[in-house]
Amino acid sequence: MKYFLLLLFFILAPRVVDAEVTVVINSEKFVFLGNPRLTDVLTPVAQKRHWYWPSSALFRLDGVNAEQQRREVLTSLVIIEQESDVALANSVQHLKQQVQAWQLADRVEQTIDFDLARLDPNFNPRFEDGHYLLLLKERPTTIEVFGLTANPTTLSQQHKMCLARQLHKTYSELENKDLIYLIQADSTITTSGIAYWNKNCGDVMPGSQIYLPFFESQFSDTNRKLNYAIARLAKNRVIQ
């Protein structure tokens, strides 16, 4: 009877299921039992190539936030398109098509750097249960440009890029002639002045994105909020 009760206990007792973390590193899949640290995930690939760590990006493949943000942005764009003149409506249509075509996943705000993670425990967190995509790249040579334009393009990345000169040369008509949004490769969002009188040149991280935004009025923050929402959404782009 005692053995029967023990057997019954083991059958009915809740089972502890080992945590499982799946990480696709570029195109190679790794499965970890338990919750690995960043160094555990990077060790199999860290020395394979000369990775440019600042442009590395970690995404959750089982997240839903990015797609929700996309729906909200597209809804706002439809409203603006309906209320705009023909020229702006056409530009909005092009932006909608760009946003609809993006491959998105929820970006994890985490610095990816193998050497830093080995030296500083604060940069070597454990992965929560789930499915991830980790993109590692050698040093990119281009900057992606998207936004209110029929011609999204790429610019060659250079030291001390003079964005005002390059963008006005590439795009004769800009909805916002004063500033652009810069989504750095490390997911930091900033604005940069591009007025004709702006002669400032600065460093743009390889693999960054430039968003050509709506005009922003000092009397209303509607466009500013939408511009930031689009830039924030672009952080979640999966750019192979």
Give, region by region, the residue ranges found by the protein language model.
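Ser/Thr/Pro/Gly-biased, low-complexity, turn-/loop-rich segments
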Residues: V17-Q240
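Sec-dependent N-terminal signal peptides
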Residues: F4-L12
